[in-house]
């Protein structure tokens, strides 16, 4: 696990990830989390997501109720891997600090990541490595198909809660229930 120092994950998050990994493994997708903050009124906001239409996002439908969809932005300030994924990460260019930039090794160039800073690249991990056809990244989140709501068990907390109150940033401005209700 890689985790930025101001992120909180729960036991429920770990249980979700473990179960979802089994479901998603055959598709080469990785269960992901959504970084959230609470505002002064205790409403939950997605830190780095925009409003989307669920039917425009790449997704895998698991049953009549749940799908796993690519979030607009896979940044989650962490990654959580089992042994197999960690081995893949450590034995690939995704663990190289130059990954994405390509300045020292052109084989590590990734246009999606070229402008990421070192901390952002560290959390990306395998998101952009061996992406299944039709997807934007390997990271997917569980969404209730009927309600178009992100499932609570994949929400992780950004402890400072600094973005929802900051009027000078676009981070933390979309209510969690509105992410797929555009």
Model-derived regions: residue spans:
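Short beta-strand-to-loop acidic/aromatic patch adjacent to the donor-nucleotide binding site
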Residues: 1-8
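A broadly tuned preference for mixed-charge, low-complexity surface segments
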Residues: 4, 49-62, 138-150
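Conserved catalytic core of nucleotide-sugar-dependent glycosyltransferases
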Residues: 8-105
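C-terminal catalytic/acceptor-binding lobe
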Residues: 83, 91-182
